[in-house]
Amino acid sequence: MDTIALFGGSFDPPHIGHEAIIEALKKFKDIDKIIIMPTFLNPFKSNFYAPSSLRVKWLREIFKEEKRVEVSDYEVLQNRQVPTIETAKHLLESYKKIYLVIGADNLAKLRDWNSYDELKELVTFVVATRDDIEIPDEFIMLSVDEKISSTQLRENIQLSKLPKKCAKEIYDFYKEEHCKTE
């Protein structure tokens, strides 16, 4: 295995938009493996609702039957914020090429990422479409039709927007969390 797609994120909660991204990535013929990497701590967010161990558990349940998909707890096990550059360097010890998958909503802050200039030399960016955000030609565009975000979902949790394999568990968790914050 030489080529991977790295799809990192908070996944707080995981939703059908994340599943749609994985389905679109599976169509890339040169990707040997898709690695989903939940963050321990997102540098652009102040907190998480679901603990990292629970987010990893949900993702593993959702994608357990996908042969080319692995849910990695590498960043979670570091018990700290892990810059993407660090994760990329770690993975390049085992793989030759990395497609780094981000949502179009991340483009506005991309140049603020830790060691962005070095990172763009190490990975090929793949940008999932979202909210009609224009994707510059320097990136590979990944067409995804789901109009959903984890933030919107936390504010108005809907079973229909959650992955079927653990929808009820995720729904119940966020319903209870929402009640605590009201």
Swiss-Prot record:
Example GO BP: NAD biosynthetic process
Gene Ontology MF annotations: ATP binding; nicotinate-nucleotide adenylyltransferase activity
Superkingdom of this protein's organism: Bacteria
Record keywords: ATP-binding, NAD, Nucleotide-binding, Nucleotidyltransferase, Pyridine nucleotide biosynthesis, Transferase
EC id: 2.7.7.18
Pfam family of the protein (one): CTP_transf_like
UniProt key word NAD: yes
UniProt entry tagged with the keyword Isomerase: no
The protein's annotated pathway: Cofactor biosynthesis; NAD(+) biosynthesis; deamido-NAD(+) from nicotinate D-ribonucleotide: step 1/1
Disulfide bridges in this chain: none
InterPro entries: Cyt_trans-like (IPR004821), NadD/NMNAT (IPR005248), Rossmann-like_a/b/a_fold (IPR014729)
EC category name: transferase
Catalytic reaction annotation: nicotinate beta-D-ribonucleotide + ATP + H(+) = deamido-NAD(+) + diphosphate
Family classification: Belongs to the NadD family.
PANTHER family given in the database record: NICOTINATE-NUCLEOTIDE ADENYLYLTRANSFERASE-RELATED (PTHR39321), PHOSPHOPANTETHEINE ADENYLYLTRANSFERASE (PTHR39321:SF3)
Role of this protein: Catalyzes the reversible adenylation of nicotinate mononucleotide (NaMN) to nicotinic acid adenine dinucleotide (NaAD).
Protein name: Probable nicotinate-nucleotide adenylyltransferase
Organism: Sulfurimonas denitrificans (strain ATCC 33889 / DSM 1251)
